[in-house]
Amino acid sequence: MRASGAVVTAGEPLKLRVASLIDHLDQKVFDAIYSRSLVYNTCWEDPAVDRQALQLTSNDTILVITSAGCNTLDYALQAPRRIHAVDANPRQTALLELKIAGIRGLDFEDFFLLFGHGRHARFRDLYGDVLRRDLSSFAQSYWDKNGAWFCQEDARDTFYYFGLSGMVARATMPDKPK
């Protein structure tokens, strides 16, 4: 059978080609989304369960997917020898870097306003005076462009409502959080 100049055969090979095409398109969509935005702004897993199961010690070196950095920081509570946080999306690593810079340079109240509430009226000052110097050049560039996510006044416009997870939250939560 001919369609638009291509030879098309019915049966199993056609099913495999369609499945392959769907997989290809799925990967293209994933790559387009994942390579252009912060996907995870918080983690939903329970790393305490992992810590209990792994029984990490000071002799351990672990490899984790960075995601939003929450699990990486939780594993650090066990003080393993080294943690390697990797992610295909460098924006996730930029978020972990920002959190580490905050842990090192901010008091609890400022850190919690940033990452507990997702906003801080003085973010630009804190970023310029304290946080930025501890970031890689990629993370600096990323947060130079996206730091406004932490400067919003409206509860629906906090850091947690930006990036891909934030878009999903906006779409699924009809009412603003209080």
PLM regions with names:
Residues 85-90:
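Conserved acidic E/D residue at the C-terminus of a beta-strand in Rossmann-like folds
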Residues 2-32:
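N-terminal, positively charged/glycine-rich alpha-helical extensions of SAM-dependent methyltransferases
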Residues 68-80:
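Conserved SAM-binding loop of SAM-dependent methyltransferases across substrates and taxa
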Residues 9-18, 91-178:
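Class I S-adenosyl-L-methionine-dependent methyltransferase module
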Residues 58-67, 83-84:
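Conserved class I S-adenosyl-L-methionine
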Residues 38-61, 74:
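Conserved alpha-helix/loop element of class I SAM-dependent methyltransferases that forms part
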